[in-house]
Amino acid sequence: MMYMEKDLIDYKFSEDRLLDDLKAYIDSTYNAHYSKTKFQATEFIFDAGHGMGFCIGNVLKYAQRYGRKDGYNRKDLQKVLHYAIMALHVHDIEKKEST
């Protein structure tokens, strides 16, 4: 289990399970063919200062694609969440914020 305190929370929308699923999906992207080199292309985009636009663009892309390409594809929603997490990462670095 991801969170020790989750046993104390009565999740109404399966957030605990969905977060575990999302983490497994994100972990799988690090084993994908495009991450076999030392650096991912996304890192170069971030380093060039285009990280937020790249992430928000992909959030919009996969949100718009949901239900159109390959039907109502769960993976499209996972990609929306993954890019949103990366956007949060960029935000925290740029604004020097974190939890």
Task: Give the location of each predicted region.
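Intrinsically disordered, low-complexity regulatory regions
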Residues: 1-99
